[in-house]
Regions:
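Membrane-proximal cytoplasmic juxtamembrane segment of single-pass receptors
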Residues: 3-129, 134-144, 149-181, 226-230, ...
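C-terminal lobe substrate-recognition/regulatory segment of protein kinase catalytic domains
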Residues: 73, 289-330
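Protein kinase catalytic-loop region centered on the HRD/HxD motif
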Residues: 181-194
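Activation segment
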Residues: 247-253
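Conserved catalytic-loop aspartate of Hanks-type protein kinases
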Residues: 256
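Regulatory extensions flanking the kinase catalytic core
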Residues: 330-354
Length: 354
């Protein structure tokens, strides 16, 4: 009996020592990450500002940044979304940022803010918007992003006459491939994997070279590598949501694939997913396109500005969009497969359902 108690005591001590060592290791790894990635972290007016390492921030101090931020007004607004308002922050003639202000309203909103930081902190990819830092206070939170000079894909395709511009086919293809690569990186290469949950043309921003950058992780859900879904509140935008959202309330990577398929249709048709003409008829872009396909009148789908573009490239992209828009999620490709198929278009290979 005494021998058994001794063994149990020994095992308990070993378990406690193991747990403590894991905690210490986690703290050390976090401090190492922080030393490597954080330029400064300091209090300011009851809040805290954290900036990550970046060449563009070498000479910028938190005092200058926050003084400029506190002067933002409605005239600086460049966009708004479900999680907050976006402002243009001009530091000087050559340095500017996009600042998203998130109002602190509920505990859920705070959790969303922390989730966004966790998702964005270490992500570095040419097709994903860069998070430079954040400011957290009892009253509001600020996310500080790189500013994209060409705005959003939505503005180019559907903006007012002074904003919208004609995009040629090579540019549309480049945007589609870049956005696909960014989403695929979130799905397959980030640990934990990330489901965006709000893929749409207004969340695809364009840099000075018209390269796509996937933005707005305020609605991002982190997915453990061994999980296939996350059961949380449904977030997204009408016209882009996969049909299974309304049945199950589950966010999945295949839901993002569906939303990306809608973006491909926008690029091909030039139409908004919830165009007024569709709403008047009680339908939407996806339903309209599928109806036209069933009637074998695909030529009526394309944006008129694409009439002289390479037919094979257009048709292959259209086929990829339809694969992404399969009603059954299991029949949709993964984003990695979508990237591969889009890359095949320029190589001259025929796109087939994988």
């Amino acid at each position: 009996m005494a021998n058994d108690l001794g063994i149990a005591f020994y095992i308990t001590i070993c378990c406690i020592a193991f747990i403590i060592s894991k905690i210490i290791l986690t703290i050390l790894l976090y401090k190492r990450w922080k030393q490597k990635n954080v330029i400064y972290e300091e209090g300011f007016s009851g809040g805290k500002v954290v900036m990550f390492r970046s060449p563009v921030l070498q000479s910028l101090t938190s005092d200058v940044l926050l003084k400029k931020t506190l002067k933002l007004s409605n005239k600086d607004i460049i966009g708004a979304g479900g999680y907050g308002t976006v402002y243009r922050l001009m530091i000087n003639d050559t340095l500017a940022f996009a600042v998203k202000r998130l109002n602190r309203g509920t505990a859920d909103r705070d959790k969303g803010f922390e989730r966004e930081l966790e998702a964005m902190g270490d992500i570095k990819h040419r097709n994903i918007i860069t998070l430079h830092g954040y400011y957290s206070s009892p009253h509001y939170n600020l996310l500080i992003y790189e500013l994209m000079p060409n705005g959003s894909l939505d503005a180019f395709l559907h903006g007012k006459s002074m904003e919208s511009k004609i995009l040629d086919w090579p540019t549309r293809y480049k945007i589609a491939l870049g956005a696909a690569r960014g989403i695929a990186y979130l799905h397959h290469d980030c640990i934990p994997h990330i489901i965006h949950r709000d893929i749409k043309s207004s969340n695809i921003l364009l840099d000075q070279n018209m390269e796509a950058r996937v933005s707005d992780f305020g609605l991002a859900t982190l997915m453990e590598p061994d999980k296939t879904h996350v059961s949380t509140f449904v977030a997204g935008t009408f016209g882009y949501l996969a049909p299974e959202y309304f049945d199950t309330g589950r966010a999945t990577g295949k839901g993002d694939v569906y939303s990306f398929g809608v973006v491909l249709l926008e690029l091909l048709t030039g139409k908004k997913p919830t165009d007024e003409a569709f709403l008047e008829e009680g339908t939407k872009l996806v339903t309209w396109v599928k109806g036209v396909v069933e009637e074998r009148r695909e030529e009526y789908v394309l944006d008129s500005s694409l009439s002289s573009c390479p037919v094979d490239e257009i048709n292959n992209t259209f086929n990829i969009a339809l694969m992404c828009l399969e009603t059954d999620p299991s029949k949709r490709p993964t984003m990695a497969e979508v990237v591969k198929m889009l890359e095949q278009i320029k190589s001259g290979s025929a796109v087939t359902d994988s």
